[in-house]
Curated annotation (Swiss-Prot):
Organism field: Zea mays
Family: Belongs to the phytochrome family.
Modification note: Contains one covalently linked phytochromobilin chromophore.
Region feature (Disordered): 1-23
Purpose of the protein: Regulatory photoreceptor which exists in two forms that are reversibly interconvertible by light: the Pr form that absorbs maximally in the red region of the spectrum and the Pfr form that absorbs maximally in the far-red region. Photoconversion of Pr to Pfr induces an array of morphogenic responses, whereas reconversion of Pfr to Pr cancels the induction of those responses. Pfr controls the expression of a number of nuclear genes including those encoding the small subunit of ribulose-bisphosphate carboxylase, chlorophyll A/B binding protein, protochlorophyllide reductase, rRNA, etc.
Keyword Transcription recorded: yes
Binding site for phytochromobilin: 324
GO function terms (MF aspect): phosphorelay sensor kinase activity; photoreceptor activity; protein homodimerization activity
GO CC terms: nucleus
Disulfide bond residue pairs: none
Gene name tied to this protein: PHYA1
Residues in Histidine kinase domain copies: 904-1124
Descriptive protein name: Phytochrome A
Protein origin, superkingdom: Eukaryota
Phylogenetic classification of the source organism: Eukaryota, Viridiplantae, Streptophyta, Embryophyta, Tracheophyta
Gene Ontology biological process terms, A to Z: detection of visible light; red, far-red light phototransduction; regulation of DNA-templated transcription
Length: 1131
């Protein structure tokens, strides 16, 4: 379903992309119209009225392509810069000036009395060679940028003017046909000359990054509050906000911190037009935007007249803001601002990349929001601090992505749970009324303010819903206008063209519809968005009048309310998918209930599914066991209580503890005391489903290995799960790092020439690379060449972060921008002097093969203790370990597929069962005789038994007595139980010529008792089935029973029920009988598992099962405890 139009079969992600593109195009046109009106109107510009007028204008009348092009050209090529720096545009071939700002000659060539002997100062103009303006090495470094594909890696370049000796940060970016260089003065007192270099900027953000990384997941609010607090402390601005874009492109101040006395904007919503699409595009290109003084006069750019097109300033921080934005800032007393873009992965759920997919094919990016800083006086932030803020925003974006993933998992789980509950309610009553009148109901499926059901020409309403006549009118409109669609969703009935939208008022704006049949419809309703908006900490009464011509956040809030007064929150794709799923279930239920269902083939489907699933799982399990035993890496496993149940030969060899000695011991007794808390935490988290990676702990050694010291392992904890995705144990897949640590310790102790160690071809020397304090690659050993395919001379003296490792245009490609950010954090932590933990790391080698490894980073210091760079050690898991991890992943995927298959089968079976129920209910009203009614009752009982079995699919371990299998307490007749159970084996008896004889006392069998008759029927049918299966052809099965009444009070009696099933022949094989008594036997057969479940049910009834084997005869003796019905007590 798609917004404001009929449903289609396209995927959620494609619908999102289509609607997003449409919104962007529409807003860009509106932005251009507003800009043109502002330029023409001057002081008479009325922002509020124009937003409302443009919203009501038909799309075909909005804007003209000429206006849009002119607007975009004006934004990107405005030929004006801010005066806190100057700008040069250089021809890439000649290195000569082709454009410069009017203030550049004064800033770059003015002679200073502090610099003697400047006889002929250079002049700056069109055609000037830029080398004549600066001293070496700055001029050389600037020229070196010409050969870089991504020149931003070199920023900032520290240059010094020849005439004045003044230092500048040269910030380089590439535009069409030229290099554009921003020059910003350096204040040596605040940032000494040695501060140039991207890695130094990362150090400024180290504290803030650590704070963000230490946050527990699960709270977007806490994450946003933390980042605004850290930016506030880092930059010193008066106000810092986290500004979030919603799906319809409007914005909201999601988090905020201010200095005392400043009015907060927290909770304020802005129209989408407040931040034009052109500005958002520029934020995607240049992720930090600074305005130092909105009252300062802009500086013009002088260009070579031979240029065919104006210089693009998209990448320039100096680019002058639009006059409209400057007026907006001044009106809200925000004289200076700093804005960082928060760029996250596009939400394309159907296009999830594979783990080893090249980075060029990774997800697209989108602008989630902005981190906005305001100051009430002019403020300049030097480039190193701005770069630190940009990096902090990238780290924040990585965590926003993680929160999205977590929210998605929780959301899908909740929707699946609600769909299951609603499906069960539908199945029980075979009518959609149950999901309206019951609890939960359809309002619990998606967020809404009201809902309704039109079914059988009757209307049922829930909470805030239109009247019955209005719902019928909406249904008529749907049939007339959207008759061919299966549903509809819109955030505005008015915009969707419903003629009666005005009569519904503001409380009914958005609607989602699912048609069950042409006349039966489900509705969900939402109120207008303004009802969801709260002003947090407002001191200004929103009802007070503002000057509509004065652009201000308060006025934007008013404009937003005007825009959305007829709109609700939009219906998201996952909500529409949930509605569509319920729609399909309802259709299947009602369609199957309208005709007799065909039950043939049902048993075969279930049987095939079980057999296929068991065979596949057994094959994978066997492979896992074989791999674990023969792997050349240490692998150990524990059960839910921490007792060792897996200990392969490799870990036995390293520790000196044999397999038979380790099995059954608690894992905490086998690790060194210093590692007990680590392993305890790791085990606890893994049993909760949270798997820790790359944790280092030490294992005790025994026997001949005792004197060798502990075994140092780096371990991944892998939760072992059953078919129902429940954690039943933990597997530890490890790497022996003992030798690796010895090499590293030896390396770090060497004070002299370390090259002999780095470049030693000994296979024990791991791959090593390094960088100096400025980020240039300084080391690349032979093992690294073998691992990556890149030779030392191809990478040394290149930027480690950017040219050697990057998500694009690098020697070793990383699979995503997030991975690059994580690598930057690890390197930065080491440079800042922090003890860095081992981190998972991956890259594509020269042959585009993906390499997964562990990375440890150590800082390199000189004799004075000053950090001069970093050394990075790589440890690559063996092929056996990687294969074991892949097999484990395959096992988990297989279990997940089986779980989904069982879930599908349960829902698929419900529909034909509903049809069977309908057929029997119809037969009851056709005047059946007593025998025919008895057969119908047998069918009902079998139906209810199957319902119980399907519900058991949710149980974790149904063979365990402590499982949550439920027992009902209801009145039933024992004869009905036995007859229904016998009916389930009669076809098998006829095929083998087996006679079934029931020697049951009639009075006892017709007695009414209390208990779970359906579960008892299930038990009896299971034991009858195996008795018939293992009886010889032409044999017999005899059934007898005995009831013993025990009084436990004046009016309360318990009945000890005993049922014997005797059959001829060799009987049930001994191995199946033994499986019946084993609760956790991985080798259980289908019959053994079924009997184990039945025995568990009997034990829940305070009974049990015994088996007697005599000459040529076998007997099952079933016992259970029941309660006597009052009528039975009176007899």
């Amino acid at each position: 379903m798609s917004s404001s139009r009929p449903a289609h079969s396209s995927s959620s992600s494609s619908r999102t992309r289509q609607s997003s593109r449409a919104r962007i195009l529409a807003q860009t046109t509106l932005d251009a119209e507003l800009n043109a009106e502002y330029e023409e109107s001057g002081d008479s510009f009325d922002y509020s009225k124009l937003v409302e007028a443009q919203r009501s204008t038909p799309p075909e009348q909005q804007g003209r392509s000429g206006k849009v092009i002119a607007y975009l050209q004006h934004i990107q090529r405005g030929k004006l810069i801010q005066p806190f720096g100057c700008l040069l545009a250089l021809d890439e071939k000649s290195f000569r000036v082709i454009a410069f700002s009017e203030n550049a000659p004064e800033m770059l060539t003015t002679v200073s009395h502090a610099v003697p002997n400047v006889d002929d100062p250079p002049k700056l103009g069109i055609g000037t060679n830029v080398r004549s303006l600066f001293t070496d090495p700055g001029a050389t470094a600037l020229q070196k940028a010409l050969g870089f594909a991504d020149v931003s890696l070199l920023n900032p370049i520290l240059v010094q003017c020849k005439t004045s000796g003044k230092p500048f940060y040269a910030i380089v970016h590439r535009a069409t046909g030229c290099l554009v260089v921003d020059f910003e003065p350096v204040k040596p007192t605040e940032f000494p000359a040695t501060a140039a270099g991207a890695l130094q900027s990362y150090k400024l953000a180290a504290k803030a990054i650590s704070k963000i990384q230490s946050l527990p997941g699960g709270s977007m609010e806490a994450l946003c509050n933390t980042v605004v607090k850290e930016v506030f402390d880092l930059t010193g601005y008066d106000r810092v906000m986290a500004y979030k874009f919603h799906e319809d492109e409007h914005g909201e101040v999601f988090a905020e911190i201010t200095k005392p006395g400043i009015e907060p904007y927290i909770g304020l919503h802005y129209p989408a037009t407040d931040i034009p699409q052109a500005a958002r595009f520029l934020f995607m290109k240049n992720k930090v935007r600074m305005i130092c003084d909105c009252r300062a006069r802009s500086v013009k750019i002088i260009e070579d007249e031979a240029l065919s097109i104006d210089i693009s300033l998209c990448g320039s921080t100096l680019r002058a803001p639009h006059s409209c934005h400057l007026k907006y800032m001044e009106n809200m007393n925000s004289i200076a601002s700093l804005v960082m873009a928060v760029v996250v992965n596009e939400n394309e759920e159907d296009d999830e990349p594979e783990p080893e997919q090249p980075p060029q094919q990774q997800k697209k990016k989108r602008l989630w929001g902005l981190i906005v800083c305001h100051h009430e006086s002019p403020r300049y932030v030097p480039f190193p601090l701005r770069y630190a803020c940009e990096f902090l925003a990238q780290v924040f974006a990585v965590h926003v992505n993680k929160e999205f993933e977590l929210e998605k998992q929780i959301r899908e789980k909740n929707i699946l749970r609600m769909q299951t509950m609603l499906s069960d309610m539908l199945f029980k009553e075979s009518s959609p009324l149950s999901i309206v009148s019951g609890s939960p109901n359809i309002m619990d499926l998606v967020k809404c303010d009201g809902a309704a059901l039109l079914y059988g020409d009757k209307v049922w309403r829930l909470q805030t819903a239109p009247t019955e006549s209005q719902i019928r009118d909406i249904a008529f409109w749907l049939s007339e206008v959207h008759g061919d669609s299966t549903g509809l969703s819109t955030d505005s009935l008015q915009d969707a063209g419903y003629p009666g939208a005005a009569s519904l008022g503001d409380m009914i704006c958005g609607m989602a519809v699912a048609k069950i049949t042409s006349k039966d419809i489900l509705f969900w309703f939402r109120s207008h968005t303004a009802a969801e908006i709260k002003w947090g900490g407002a001191k200004h009464d929103p009802s007070d009048k503002d000057d509509n011509r004065r652009m201000h956040p308060r006025l934007s809030f008013k404009a937003f309310l005007e825009v959305v007064k007829t709109k609700s929150l939009p219906w998201s794709d996952y909500e529409m998918d949930a509605i569509h799923s319920l729609q399909l279930i309802l259709r299947g239920t009602l369609n199957d209930a309208s005709k007799p269902a065909q039950a043939s083939g049902l048993d075969n489907q279930i049987g095939d599914l079980k057999l296929d699933g068991l065979a596949e799982l057994q094959a994978v399990t066997s492979e896992m066991v074989r791999l674990m035993e023969t792997a050349t890496v240490p692998i150990l496993a524990v059960d839910g209580n921490g007792l060792v149940n897996g200990w392969n030969q490799k870990v036995a060899e390293l520790s000196g503890l044999r397999v038979d000695e380790a099995i059954g011991r608690h894992i905490l007794t086998l690790v060194e005391d210093s590692s007990v808390s680590l392993v305890q935490r790791m085990l606890y988290l893994a049993l909760q489903g949270r798997e820790e990676k790359e944790v280092r702990f030490e294992l005790k050694t025994h026997g001949s290995k005792r004197d060798d010291g502990p075994v140092i392992l780096v371990v991944n904890a892998c939760a072992s799960r059953d078919l129902h995705d429940h954690v039943v144990g933990v597997c530890f897949v490890a790497q022996d790092m003992t030798v690796h640590k010895l090499v590293m310790d030896k390396f770090t102790r060497v004070e002299g020439d370390y090259k002999a160690i780095i470049h030693n071809p000994n296979p024990l020397i791991p791959p090593i690379f390094g960088a100096d304090q400025f980020g240039w690659c300084s080391e690349w050993n032979a093992a690294m060449t073998k691992l990556t395919g890149w030779h030392r001379d191809e990478v040394v003296d290149k930027m480690l972060l950017g040219e050697v490792f990057n998500s694009s245009n690098a020697s070793c490609l990383l699979k995503s921008k997030d991975a690059f950010v994580r690598l930057c954090i690890v390197i930065n932590s080491a440079l800042a002097g922090e003890e860095a933990e081992k981190a998972s790391f991956g890259f594509f080698d020269r042959n585009e093969k993906y390499v997964e490894c562990l990375l440890s980073v150590n800082r390199k210091v000189n004799a004075d203790g000053v950090v001069t760079g970093v050394f990075c050690f790589i440890h690559v898991p063996s092929d056996d370990l990687q294969h074991a991890l892949h097999v484990q992943q395959a096992s988990e995927q297989t279990a997940q597929r089986k779980l989904k298959a069982f879930s599908y089968m349960r829902h698929a079976i419900n529909k034909p069962l509903s049809g069977m129920l309908y057929s029997r209910e119809t037969l009851k009203s056709t005047g059946l005789n007593e025998e025919q009614m008895r057969q119908v009752r047998v069918g009902d009982n079998c139906h209810r038994q199957l319902n119980k079995i399907l519900a058991d699919l949710d149980q974790d371990n149904i063979t365990d007595k402590s499982s949550c299998l439920d027992l009902d307490m209801a009145e039933f007749v024992l004869q009905d139980v036995v007859v229904s159970a016998v009916s389930q084996v009669l076809i098998g008896c006829q095929a083998k010529g087996i006679r079934v004889a029931c020697n049951l006392p009639e009075r006892s069998m017709k007695q009414k008792v209390y208990g779970d008759g359906i579960r008892l029927q299930q038990i009896v049918s299971d034991f009858l089935f195996v008795s018939v299966k293992f009886s010889p052809a032409g044999g017999s099965v005899d059934i007898s029973s005995k009831l013993t009444k025990n009084s436990i009070g004046e009016n309360l009696h318990l009945i000890d029920f005993e049922l014997r099933i005797k059959h001829r022949g060799a009987g049930v094989p001994a191995e199946i009988l033994s499986q019946m008594y084993e609760e956790d036997n991985k080798e259980q057969s289908e019959e053994g598992f079924s009997l184990a479940v039945s025995r568990n049910l009997l034990r829940l009834m305070n009974g049990d099962i015994r088996h007697l084997r005599e000459a040529g005869m076998s007997t099952f003796i079933l016992t259970a405890e029941l309660a006597a019905a009052p009528s039975a007590v009176g007899r």
